Amino acid sequence: MPKSKRDKKVSLTKTAKKGLELKQNLIEELRKCVDTYKYLFIFSVANMRNSKLKDIRNAWKHSRMFFGKNKVMMVALGRSPSDEYKDNLHQVSKKLRGEVGLLFTNRTKEEVNEWFTKYTEMDFARAGNKATLTVSLDPGPLKQFPHSMEPQLRQLGLPTALKKGVVTLLSDYEVCKEGDVLTPEQARILKLFGYEMAEFKVIIKYMWDAQSGRFQQMDDDLPESAPESEGESEEEDDS
């Protein structure tokens, strides 16, 4: 009787070795960037969206961006003056908490600040986000939805029914009030009706100068991101 493919054993040693190699490659790549670029910026992300971050990577192909794997980045840069790769990089490591990333570039502080201050993209809010406005729906036909979606809309809490094959809202319905912390159902309804309430934004927080080794906080009047969490993001980095 032939063996099932599901019975195939996976060597944990090989898996661990591959993971170690990936981390080592990332460390080497980060240090190479430290040696190559004039400036290193730490950025945080509000309302993280992978697709939006990819757009920024494409716009900044002349530079390098790394996001996630905070602990590995800290090892690459150094956690203290005694093991830092270059002067003052341990100060960078201290700030690698939560959803933050690194931007290596030859663009000046002014160029970086100007570009990222202007760059914002709206997207649909997710559960846990705050509603930025009050949304109410008027009764009547909802011709944008096929009849097959009526049960789904009703399941989300909307007072709907099929009238002559057309999805119809039977009465006024308040989806959310400004300032509400959105539930999964509210977030889904807002997306179905096209309301974008989440602002994706990259906030430049700190800068390190490769030539002088100077580490500085960016202007205090820059908008703040959401509070940093103790955990680290596991998004894929650019390696």
Curated annotation (Swiss-Prot):
Segment Disordered: which positions?
216-239
- InterPro entries this protein is in? Mrt4, Ribosomal_uL10, Ribosomal_uL10-like_insert, Ribosomal_uL10-like_insert_sf, Ribosomal_uL10-like_sf, Ribosome_Assembly_uL10
Q: Which Pfam families match?
A: Ribosomal_L10, RL10P_insert
Gene Ontology BP term (one): ribosomal large subunit assembly
In terms of domain of life, where is this protein from?
Answer: Eukaryota
- GO CC annotation: cytoplasm; nucleolus
Annotated keywords: Cytoplasm, Nucleus, Phosphoprotein, Ribosome biogenesis
Q: Where in the cell is it found?
A: Nucleus, Nucleolus; Cytoplasm
* Chain positions found as Phosphoserine: S225, S229, S233
Q: What is its main location?
A: nucleus
What ranges does the record list as Acidic residues composition bias?
218-239
Family recorded in the similarity comment: Belongs to the universal ribosomal protein uL10 family.
Role summary: Component of the ribosome assembly machinery. Nuclear paralog of the ribosomal protein P0, it binds pre-60S subunits at an early stage of assembly in the nucleolus, and is replaced by P0 in cytoplasmic pre-60S subunits and mature 80S ribosomes.
The entry describes its oligomerization and partners as:
Associates with the pre-60S ribosomal particle. Interacts with MINAS-60 (product of an alternative open reading frame of RBM10).
> What is the name of this protein?
mRNA turnover protein 4 homolog
Task: Give the taxonomic lineage as stored in the record.
Answer: Eukaryota, Metazoa, Chordata, Craniata, Vertebrata
